[in-house]
A protein has these predicted regions:
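Extracellular glycan-associated modules
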Residues: 1-248
Length: 248
């Protein structure tokens, strides 16, 4: 192997590393493939916290189920409200919900609550029995919701979200209940299906990044698989004649 070939190989490695660093900057894979009906807890110490942030995940809704929970008799003034189709919930101190991404109990509408805002940001008619990519991007008090790589909803919060902390816990799947401003996990939920490739970014997602994640597919690792889907072909030319080829 001559010096020119070695130089080209080193240059290729440097370029690929630079592309990888750009594509994965501030981005962490939180969890892989999981049963959506079971609650999976992930300590947020593994992926940090920031004022601007984003989550991306794939969901597959296999079937729709509603568990009827009988009300108390007589009904309590502060009766618990059950959310049986949790996708992602970030919780502070085990009781305060900072971020709730879930499906409506009665219909296939995607809803997002941040910092307990009274009105959720909603996307109606999420497709059933099909893998769907959801990417949430938070910048200040603006929330962008992407579905399959396309921006479909922007919501403006009345206040800037509470800063996230590495001591928070992220719950993937399962369900939860709220009562008098407190939050508690339900180990089993009504979301029959799967959740795959949950990705956290300690900054907002750009439209290009949302599309890249969707393009990578549910079976990959989101942005981490983007580089692996492409190959680079280089030809080594001497006196207008190809003397070697390198494929990465």
């Amino acid at each position: 192997m001559n010096l020119l070939t070695i130089f080209v190989l080193v240059l290729i490695i440097v370029l690929i590393y630079a592309v990888y660093q750009i594509m994965t900057k501030s981005t962490t894979k939180v969890s892989g493939f999981s049963d959506a009906s079971k609650s999976l807890s992930v300590p947020c110490s593994k992926f940090g916290a920031n004022a601007n942030f984003g989550y991306s995940t794939w969901i597959y809704i296999d079937s729709w189920q509603n568990t009827v929970i009988p009300p108390a008799n007589p009904p309590a003034a502060n009766a618990a409200i059950f959310f049986k189709k949790n996708i992602l919930s970030r919780v502070k101190d085990g009781t305060t919900a900072l971020f709730n991404l879930y499906l409506d109990n009665a219909q296939n509408d995607l809803k997002l609550l941040i910092n307990g805002t009274p009105t959720p940001c909603t996307i109606k008619n999420i497709k059933l029995q099909k893998w769907v990519n959801i990417t949430i991007s938070v910048y200040g008090n603006t929330v962008d919701m992407y579905l399959d790589g396309k921006l479909v909803r922007t919501c403006v919060l009345t206040t800037v979200p509470t800063a996230l902390a590495t001591s928070d816990t992220l719950y993937v799947g399962g369900g939860y209940q709220t009562q008098t401003s407190t939050w508690s996990v339900l180990p089993d939920g009504d979301l029959r299906g799967y959740i795959s490739n949950v990705v956290y970014k300690s900054d907002y997602f750009t439209p290009e990044e949302a599309w890249t994640i969707y393009s990578a597919g549910y079976s990959g690792a989101g942005m981490f698989d983007f580089v692996n889907r492409y190959k680079l072909n280089f030809s080594i030319v001497k006196d207008d004649q190809t003397v070697g080829q390198v494929s990465i």
